[in-house]
Swiss-Prot record:
This is Putative MgpC-like protein MPN_092. Belongs to the MgpC family. It comes from Mycoplasma pneumoniae (strain ATCC 29342 / M129 / Subtype 1) (Mycoplasmoides pneumoniae). It comes from the Bacteria.
Length: 173
């Protein structure tokens, strides 16, 4: 039987009438290309891990600049996005920081000297015990630190191995 694409065509399931040899060279070539790319790029695993984490953050509402196109300011060319009245600068690198609340009666704001940004899960101290750990998603050149930059680990739904994929230093929960 000959397919409508012709005898021996890669699109035909039967190839030359009785065998599917038309597909074999194509599949072999594709497998070789994939193998070569994996061997040449030692960072493939790290990039895949980062991409999965970035996509997860994007779906949770934490906008990752590489996955979202933001309009730039004409004067500076720095990409920004206004969220809740706060202008947030886009960054090429996202950092995770861990902060442990000392007193639950105080405002839950970490005293870090690094700008942070988080676009969802603004947690208040209500319902959190002393010693509750929060994960702060930060980026260089972002806005000042505030309670809106916090999220608790259980709400972030990120394990420390995922967090390490895009952070500057290891983060444990």
């Amino acid at each position: 039987m000959v397919s409508k694409w012709g005898a021996g065509s890669a699109f035909g399931l039967q190839g030359n009438g009785s065998n599917s040899s038309g597909l074999r060279p194509l599949l072999k070539r594709t497998a070789q290309i994939n193998l070569r790319q994996t061997q040449d790029n030692a960072q493939t695993g790290k990039f895949s891990k980062y991409l999965n984490t970035a996509q997860a953050l994007h779906q949770m509402g934490v906008i990752v600049p590489s996955l979202e196109t933001w309009p730039g300011k004409p004067s500076t060319g720095i990409a920004t996005r206004a969220v809740g009245g706060v202008s947030v600068q886009a960054a090429t690198r996202l950092d995770f920081y861990k902060w442990r609340s000392a007193e639950c009666n105080n405002k839950v704001i970490p005293h870090l000297h690094v700008p942070t940004r988080l676009l969802k899960w603004p947690d208040r101290c209500d319902g959190f015990k002393r010693g509750t750990e929060f994960v702060v998603l930060g980026c260089r050149g972002g806005p000042g630190i505030g309670s809106r930059n916090l999220m608790s680990p259980h709400r972030a739904q990120l394990g420390h191995r995922q967090a390490e994929a895009v952070c500057r230093k290891p983060v444990g929960f």
